[in-house]
UniProtKB/Swiss-Prot annotation:
Keyword check for Signal: yes
Keyword set includes Transmembrane helix: no
Entry keywords, A to Z: Carbohydrate metabolism, Chitin degradation, Chitin-binding, Disulfide bond, Glycosidase, Hydrolase, Plant defense, Polysaccharide degradation, Signal
Pfam families named in the record: Chitin_bind_1, Glyco_hydro_19
Entry protein name: Chitinase 12
Gene Ontology terms: biological process: amino sugar metabolic process; cell wall macromolecule catabolic process; chitin catabolic process; defense response to fungus; polysaccharide catabolic process
Organism of provenance: Oryza sativa subsp. japonica (Rice)
Domain Chitin-binding type-1: from-to ranges: 22-62
Molecular function GO terms recorded: beta-N-acetylglucosaminidase activity; chitin binding; chitinase activity; endochitinase activity
Family: Belongs to the glycosyl hydrolase 19 family. Chitinase class I subfamily.
Expression sites by tissue: Expressed in meristems and at lower levels in roots and sheaths.
Length: 326
């Protein structure tokens, strides 16, 4: 999460809007009503048709509540990730991504998300296990939301409604070039490989193989990751799906395909969302007790799981995990 330096600016812009009385749904950061009450289209909890009828956001029937979570809005009727996340649900999850105060306003589109996901057919496609697929979507959007967040503790609709606010590392153009000498992935003259896109792809040794995988010259034109939304999502899905030894892929962990080795177990690395955080930024965030950045990643994950109507898995943090390779 490299965008926090701008949080004060965003907070000031919306201070007048920070007082909200709504109780649930998109108006309350994806919150779910207590006691199985319905969440109306306007963000209020109740049990009459005004709350449970047209526009109801979650727990719209007793059956939906009985499953231990909200009833997610119906999908788009498409296939793959589109069958899990409809356009309206995407807008609810990334509620403020197109806010005028966000530098990435109107960049990250639903169509680009679906198009990029379709290029990685294994994503959210665990055969016959709908809940696992939903959790993988929640985990992907949570980790990338943390990397691009514009939220703060008292932000309108809560801190976890501000994912995808940024598309470039704050100050990246004026910073270091993130180039490590490599014969395989040589840096182009005058180019910088700072964080861009949903996963904040960094360094030439990531831009090179990501570009090779998706068919784009990202070493020669790294700015594509911040100018073409589909390419931007492509790089995030590439990172998510690709193992980089000794790390497993985020996808393998999210879908239960990763079995920790004896060394992993000795390092406290056990299956769960926390290992995904370790894969992405464990060297800075994991293994030294509680960390606000890890907690932020968990907050996004819980919100998205709630919206998708699935329970959280175990081992959400990496506070006691040693980073990979340490």
């Amino acid at each position: 999460m490299r965008a926090l330096a701008v949080v004060a600016m965003v907070a000031t812009a919306f201070l007048a809007a920070a007082v909200h009385a709504e109780q649930c749904g998109s108006q309350a950061g994806g919150a779910v009503c207590p006691n199985c009450l319905c969440c109306s289209q306007f963000g209020w909890c109740g049990s009459t048709s005004d709350y449970c009828g047209a526009g109801c956001q979650s727990q719209c029937s007793a059956a939906g509540c009985g499953g231990g979570g909200p009833t997610p809005p119906s999908g788009s009727g498409g296939s793959g990730v589109a069958s899990i996340v409809s356009r309206s649900l995407f807008d609810q999850m990334l509620l403020h991504r197109n806010d005028a105060a966000c530098p990435a306003s109107n960049f990250y589109t639903y169509d680009a998300f679906v198009a990029a996901a379709s290029a990685f057919p294994g994503f959210a496609a665990a055969g016959g296990d709908a809940d696992t697929n939903k959790r993988e979507v929640a985990a992907f959007l949570a980790q990338t939301s943390h990397e691009t967040t514009g939220g703060w503790a008292t932000a309108p609709d809560g801190p976890y409604a501000w994912g995808y606010c940024f598309k470039e590392e704050n100050g990246g153009a004026a910073g270091p070039d993130y180039c490590q000498q490599s014969a395989q992935w040589p840096c182009a003259a005058g180019k910088k490989y700072y964080g861009r896109g949903p996963i904040q792809l960094s360094y030439n040794f990531n831009y090179g193989p990501a570009g090779q995988a998706i068919g784009a010259d990202l070493l020669g034109d790294p700015d594509l990751v911040a100018s073409d939304a589909t390419v931007s999502f492509d790089t995030a899905f590439w990172f998510w799906m690709t193992p980089q030894s000794p790390k497993p892929s985020c996808h393998a962990v999210a879908t239960g395909q990763w079995t920790p080795s004896a060394d992993d177990q000795a390092a406290g690395r056990v299956p769960g969302y926390g290992v995904i955080t370790n894969i992405i930024n464990g060297g800075l965030e994991c293994g030294h007790g509680e960390d606000d950045r890890v907690a932020d990643r968990i907050g996004f994950y819980k919100r998205y799981c709630d919206i998708l109507g699935v329970s959280y898995d175990a081992n959400l943090d990496c506070y006691s995990q040693r980073p990979f390779g340490s």
